[in-house]
């Protein structure tokens, strides 16, 4: 809802006129810090122990903003007293703190299923960070074990970060964060089952994606002309933070794409490509793109391109928004994930048959050529993309469900509490979407107390029966011996 300007994301988008005021609760990131952090992410490899140290630094930098956010948000809420808090994953800590302190209903938005909530035994490893298997269905026992060991190693490598976070909160006088396997507030997830592996969910954890605008920017005249004169166009975009200009990755992509053009798999390329950095442009100049086959632009109306019938393939970093848009418009995806949740989405596109993925650390031009060839000639990719497009377009209506659930939470919260004074807050009812198991111990919720009683009764009956039978046999044997 905010427009980006030279001073940060602080200008209201005019189409959201219902927003009356914006409060800035944290400082914007400096451009040099932003570039440094994304450079670390670009070169990181979550499989490598040393590389994880860099990821921990990025995570620590991002979470350090909690200090300022918590302070300013607390002052704002003390003064304004909002009726509802709707936060993002990155601001979850501060939002939870405010909810607990001021007793305000809350919802949190996640881009993918939270790895720590509603775990399923048939989903191996750490959900969202799996290396090969999204579920145990087709995984060997060793594959499942390897996913578990990878998850343990990942958590262990972040142990210092968890300790640092606790110290940061302790120094600020904040209450410890409670860990729960079930949500205690509304969680809205921008995904949908069919793309995300299905699993059982508690009522407070709701997939409401793909969340997409009903309107989007149209094609420019130049793009319209290019797409209308080509039949099989490859669209390439790597988001707003990843810069592939220069370096070996760019060279491999460019060589592989040229080979695909020469083989007739594609006849055009629309490439959203940022200008190279001044420091590297002399040593790694961009090649001369043949305008017959290439349309290069620093910015492109992505949804309009994906919606065009000439767009037959999308080469993407597998960011959440790009994946949702490609699924909605039925375009197969060749994924080159770079960091974070992009690896999970790359696994998902292969799992549902709408794409293939490449490894950023060891892919070659030959692989780019071969996979473009497969995806443009094998009908299964188009068929599965069409299937997922239908599912995604129906699922996209659930953004209205998200709004309804927020309204439900607000009304339920107002009715559940009796406020006789500022210091007297009494619960009248539990949250209407919270399962009873979330308010019970694992022992009681799992009926283990009942199982224990059954075991004691059966064990006692077995012991009594054994004792009576043994006594009877001894008496009978005594009489027989006489």
Curated annotation (Swiss-Prot):
Q: Which GO terms describe its cellular component?
A: membrane
Quote any Pfam family the record assigns: UDPGT
The UniProt keyword set, sorted, is: Glycoprotein, Glycosyltransferase, Membrane, Transferase, Transmembrane, Transmembrane helix
Q: Which reaction does it catalyse?
A: exophillate aglycone + UDP-alpha-D-glucose = exophillate + UDP + H(+)
Q: Is Transferase a UniProt keyword of this protein?
A: yes
Q: Under which pathway is this protein filed? A: Secondary metabolite biosynthesis
Query: Which enzyme class, named as a word?
Result: transferase
What the entry lists under InterPro entries is as follows:
UDP-glycosyltransferase, UDP_glucos_trans, UDP_glycos_trans_CS
Record note on biotechnological use? Phaeomoniecin D was found to show anti-HIV activity, antibacterial activity against methicillin-resistant Staphylococcus aureus (MRSA), alpha-glucosidase inhibitory activity, as well as significant protein tyrosine phosphatase 1B (PTP1B) inhibitory activity and thus is a promising candidate for drug discovery projects.
Gene Ontology MF terms:
UDP-glycosyltransferase activity
The membrane spanning regions, by residue number, are 450-470
The question of whether Coiled coil is a record keyword is answered with no
Q: Name the glycosylated positions.
A: 243
- Per UniProt, what is the membrane topology? Single-pass membrane protein
User: According to its UniProt record, where is this protein located?
Assistant: Membrane
- What EC numbers are recorded for this enzyme? 2.4.1.-
Give the function comment from the record: Acts as a depside 2-O-glucosyltransferase that catalyzes the first glycosylation step during phaeomoniecin D biosynthesis by producing the intermediate exophillic acid which is further O-galactosylated into phaeomoniecin D by the C-galactosyltransferase OGT2.
- Which family is this protein grouped under? Belongs to the glycosyltransferase 28 family.
PANTHER family referenced in this protein's UniProt entry, alphabetically: EG:EG0003.4 PROTEIN-RELATED, FI06409P-RELATED
The protein in question is named: UDP-glycosyltransferase 1
Q: What is the lineage of its organism?
A: Eukaryota, Fungi, Dikarya, Ascomycota, Pezizomycotina
């Amino acid at each position: 809802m905010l427009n980006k300007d030279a001073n940060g994301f602080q200008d209201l988008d005019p189409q959201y006129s219902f927003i009356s005021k914006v409060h800035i609760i944290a400082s914007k990131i400096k451009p040099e810090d932003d570039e440094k952090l994304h450079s670390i992410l670009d070169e990181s490899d979550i499989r490598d122990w040393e590389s994880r140290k860099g990821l921990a630094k990025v995570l620590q930098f991002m979470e350090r903003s909690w200090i300022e956010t918590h302070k300013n948000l607390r002052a704002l809420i003390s003064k304004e007293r909002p009726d509802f808090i709707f936060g993002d994953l990155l601001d979850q800590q501060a939002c939870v703190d405010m909810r607990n302190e001021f007793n305000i209903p809350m919802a949190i938005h996640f881009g993918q299923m939270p790895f720590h909530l509603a775990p399923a035994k048939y989903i191996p490893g750490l959900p969202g960070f799996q290396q090969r298997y999204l579920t145990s269905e087709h995984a060997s026992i060793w594959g499942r074990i390897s996913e578990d060991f990878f998850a343990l190693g990942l958590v262990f490598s972040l142990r210092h970060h968890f300790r640092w976070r606790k110290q940061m909160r302790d120094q600020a006088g904040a209450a410890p964060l409670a860990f729960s396997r079930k949500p205690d507030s509304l969680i809205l997830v921008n995904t949908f089952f069919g793309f995300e592996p299905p699993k059982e969910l508690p009522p407070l954890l709701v997939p409401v994606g793909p969340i997409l605008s009903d309107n989007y920017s149209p094609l420019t005249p130049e793009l319209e002309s290019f797409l209308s004169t080509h039949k099989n166009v490859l669209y390439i975009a790597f988001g707003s933070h990843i810069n592939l200009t220069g370096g070996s990755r760019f060279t491999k992509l460019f060589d592989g794409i040229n080979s695909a053009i020469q083989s007739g798999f594609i006849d055009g390329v629309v490439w959203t490509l940022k200008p190279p950095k001044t420091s590297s442009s002399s040593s790694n100049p961009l090649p001369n793109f043949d305008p017959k086959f290439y349309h290069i632009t620093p910015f492109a109306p992505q949804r309009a391109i994906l919606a065009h019938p000439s767009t037959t393939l999308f080469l993407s970093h597998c960011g959440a928004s790009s994946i949702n848009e490609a699924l909605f418009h039925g375009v197969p995806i060749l994924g080159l994930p770079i960091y974070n949740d992009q690896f999970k989405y790359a696994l998902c596109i292969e799992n549902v048959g709408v794409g293939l993925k490449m490894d950023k650390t060891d892919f070659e031009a030959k692989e780019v050529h071969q996979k473009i060839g497969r995806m443009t000639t094998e009908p299964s990719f188009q068929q599965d993309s069409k299937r997922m497009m239908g599912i995604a377009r129906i699922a996209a209506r659930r953004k209205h469900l998200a709004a309804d659930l927020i309204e439900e939470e607000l009304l339920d919260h107002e009715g559940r509490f009796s406020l006789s004074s500022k210091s007297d807050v009494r619960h009248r009812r539990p949250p209407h979407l919270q399962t009873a198991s979330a308010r019970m111990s694992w022992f009681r919720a799992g009926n283990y107390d009942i199982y224990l009683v059954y075991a004691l009764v059966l064990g006692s009956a077995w012991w009594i029966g054994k004792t009576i039978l043994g006594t009877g046999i001894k008496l009978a044997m005594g009489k027989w011996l006489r």
